[in-house]
Regions:
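Short hydrophobic/aromatic segments of transmembrane alpha-helices and their interfaces
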Residues: 1, 14-15, 26-27, 63-65, ...
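Short, amphipathic, aromatic/basic-enriched membrane-interface segments that mark the entry/exit
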Residues: 1-10
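Short hydrophobic "helix-edge" motifs at membrane interfaces and signal-peptide entry regions
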Residues: 3-4, 29-30, 67-69
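Membrane-helix interface segments
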Residues: 7, 28-29, 61, 103
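Hydrophobic alpha-helical cores of multi-pass transmembrane domains in eukaryotic membrane proteins
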Residues: 11-22, 34-48, 68-83, 111-118
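Transmembrane helix interruption/hinge and helix-loop junction motifs
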Residues: 24-32
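Short acidic alpha-helical/loop segments enriched in Asp/Glu that coordinate divalent cations
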Residues: 32-33, 51-55
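C-terminal transmembrane module of eukaryotic multi-pass membrane proteins
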Residues: 53-141
Length: 141
């Protein structure tokens, strides 16, 4: 992993994801972790997209179909379910049921989920831009 190839956003995503999944083993948040880990259901389509590039199938019908599956799964699990599950967890963290949790723990999850959700939207628009470039013909002047 390097800043040069992956970028700071990818490294932040990895660190927050890893630490968030490690720290989630508290009785209060164990059920909520599954809703967040569902974000990764879009990852196989991203990996297939990368593989098709490496196999020289960039811009092929197969890659287009995979790209549509990637976008659909991404919107569904990261932008709809992900935001909903994040809201549920943050609401629970700040409810009376979580009064015994330390403030740093609450802040870590609240801010971490905000950052991860923001990254999901940033990456979605980057994917749209990349797919537009790849699958729509360039306008001739």
């Amino acid at each position: 992993v390097s800043l040069r190839y992956e970028g700071l956003d990818f490294i932040i995503h990895g660190l927050l994801g890893l630490s968030g999944n490690i720290f989630v083993f508290k009785p209060l948040l164990m059920f909520g972790g599954m809703g967040i880990i569902m974000w990764e259901l879009s990852t196989p389509f991203l990996n297939i997209h990368w593989l098709l590039d490496k196999l020289g199938l960039t811009g092929s019908l197969l890659q287009f179909v995979n790209a549509m599956c990637l976008l659909l799964s991404y919107v569904t699990v990261r932008m709809i379910i992900g935001v909903s599950e994040s809201y549920k967890i943050v609401t629970l963290l700040w409810s009376p049921a979580a009064d015994t949790l330390a403030l740093p723990y609450k802040l870590y999850y609240t801010l971490g989920l905000l950052v991860l959700n923001a990254l999901n939207y940033i990456w979605f628009f980057k994917m749209l831009h990349a797919m537009r470039k790849r699958f729509l013909p360039a306008k001739k002047e």
